[in-house]
Regions:
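Non-catalytic, structured segments within soluble enzyme domains
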Residues: 1-79, 113, 169, 196, ...
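Active-site SXXK
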Residues: 4, 77, 107, 130-156, ...
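Conserved catalytic neighborhood of penicillin-recognizing serine enzymes
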Residues: 30-36, 40, 150-205, 221, ...
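Glycine-rich, acidic and aromatic/proline-enriched surface loops and short helix-turn segments
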Residues: 43-50, 101-116, 146-150, 161, ...
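Short active-site loop at a secondary-structure junction
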Residues: 65, 92-96, 120-140, 152-158, ...
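A penicillin-recognizing enzyme superfamily signal
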Residues: 67-90, 99-103, 112, 118-123, ...
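Mid-domain, small-residue-enriched loop/turn segments at the edges of structured enzyme/sensor domains
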Residues: 167-170, 201-238, 247, 251-254
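Long, low-complexity, intrinsically disordered segments
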Residues: 416-466
Length: 466
């Protein structure tokens, strides 16, 4: 009030009269408070500070900050985390999960859950935690291979190998002989991922990770093919965005605009930074392959009944579990684990709790877009057993102990889901592998978010690797 008087916004008479009046606190609807998206609000505050805004003035109501948050999807994420963690016996304080969603088209951050309970832990598992992604890193390896000319229909040896002193093994020690590359990703074969990184080189894989926006240091080691190196959920989800939009890396952002208390716009988000890093063909091939992960592979629990692609990831002794996936309009990454890095029970894998959380979030987040199709050239995935390969990756004169190819059996075995949460269509699981990519005429739906109003911020974001 004094500042308003000194700056001549009000007269002496108005100033004296206002001093005599009692202060009445404005009732702010709960929707506009930070308790519904506290981790996101912390992130926004940090972004505002980078832009040069004063924290005190923001927290005291000096500015109105309009954000990109999709509150309906955020609410679904908050509820999905609690429901699925408790449903799978992960109700302890150390048991945690994080969810991050953004638009691969314009970069808007839609969901930001850095943990299950902000009042007990303000540690942000979206931007601060560095946790190994397990097999959900394999698409980075496969993308590097696609960029080098390897095809989803090329054959690859799914049998044990040794690279130097490293001898990766498949989950359950199950091997299938010669299989198509797309099948290797669908069943999450560890040895096939190892063969691919050996084929294209560690440097190519690291370079692919870098151009896709993964900034966390990566070790120059073959084991990164199985996700042994930690990453941040924010940057990892950003990397998956390039598979969704034709190979473009889009920088996620949270702040649409900032207004003064008098309605003057003092900041407006600039045009989203977009760089083209993967070929359209590679993005189309990766999407076709990762669709099979959800329809026929290790990620069946994530099936939302509309075009979507993704990858499961589970690390050593089930310490970390991921599900990374996307539709044409939204990319979502989910991590589940313990803050103290201790072992979770064996049923907690990428295809269980993370996939179920992802499904719950995406069913809500994708509502405005219906069954949007990927706008990609058609990619034909030749049915298993019908491939006449141009080459076999990892082929040698020595024959594997089992000459005959086994029937496809998931190496990242999907544990039996509790009956209360098991919703997977049995017929969908038995579907033969076929082309999973829509016809070329399909188009990406890009209609704007029809969700609740943007949220103003009143204050103030290798053993058994699968």
């Amino acid at each position: 009030l004094t500042r308003m008087y000194k700056m001549r916004y009000i007269t002496t008479e108005e100033y004296e009269k206002a001093k005599e009046e009692k202060v009445h606190l404005a009732k702010v609807p709960q929707f506009y408070t930070t308790n519904k998206a506290p981790y996101f609000c912390d992130y926004v505050m940090k972004e505002l500070e980078k832009l040069g805004f004063d924290e005190t003035e923001i927290s005291q109501g000096g500015y109105k900050v309009v954000t990109t948050l999709d509150y309906k999807a955020q609410k679904a994420a908050n509820e999905a985390i609690l429901r699925n963690l408790r449903g799978w016996g992960l109700g302890g304080e150390k048991n945690q999960a994080a969810v991050f969603s953004f638009s691969p088209i314009d970069g808007k951050i839609l969901v930001y859950s850095g943990g299950k309970d902000y009042t007990k832990s303000q540690y942000d598992r979206v931007t601060q935690a560095v946790r190994p992604p397990g097999s959900s890193f394999k698409p980075i390896v496969y993308a590097a291979a696609m960029e080098k000319g390897i095809s989803p229909n090329d054959m690859i040896e799914d049998r044990p190998l040794t690279i130097g002193q490293w001898s990766p093994r498949n989950y359950g020690n199950k091997y299938r002989g010669k299989i198509p590359v797309y099948t290797a990703l669908m069943v999450s074969s560890n040895v096939c991922a190892a063969r691919l990184i050996k084929e294209v080189g560690i440097r190519s894989v690291i370079q692919t990770a870098r151009v896709l926006g993964i900034e966390t240091p990566l070790e120059y080691d073959y084991t990164i093919a199985l996700g042994s190196n930690g990453v941040k959920l924010f940057e990892f989800t950003r990397a998956y965005g390039a598979f969704a939009n034709g190979g473009y890396v889009v920088q996620p952002y949270a702040i649409e605009r900032v207004e003064t208390s008098r309605g003057k716009v003092v900041y407006k988000a600039p045009k989203t930074k977009i760089t083209h890093q993967l070929s359209m063909n590679t993005a189309a091939e990766m999407t076709a392959m990762m669709k099979t992960v959800i329809t026929n592979g290790t990620g069946r629990a994530a099936n939302i009944g509309k075009p979507a692609a993704g990858k499961t990831g589970t690390t050593d002794d089930n310490k970390d579990a991921y599900f990374m996936g996307y539709t044409p309009n939204i990319v979502t990454g989910v991590w589940v684990g313990n803050d103290d890095n201790t072992v979770m029970n064996k049923s907690i894998q990428g295809g269980t709790v993370p996939a179920l959380i992802w499904k719950d979030v995406m069913k809500v987040a994708t509502e405005p877009y219906g069954k949007a199709e990927f706008n990609y050239p058609q990619v034909e995935l030749v049915p298993f057993g019908s491939v006449n390969p141009n080459k076999v990756i990892g082929d040698t004169a020595a024959k594997p102990k089992q000459e005959e190819q086994e029937e496809i059996d998931l190496n990242e075995t999907e544990p039996v889901l509790p009956e209360s949460v098991r919703k997977i269509d049995q017929q969908q699981q038995q579907k033969p592998i076929q082309n999973q990519t829509p016809k070329p005429a399909a188009a990406v739906t890009t209609k704007p978010q029809t969700t609740a109003a943007p949220v103003p911020i009143p204050m103030a974001v290798p053993e058994g690797v699968r």
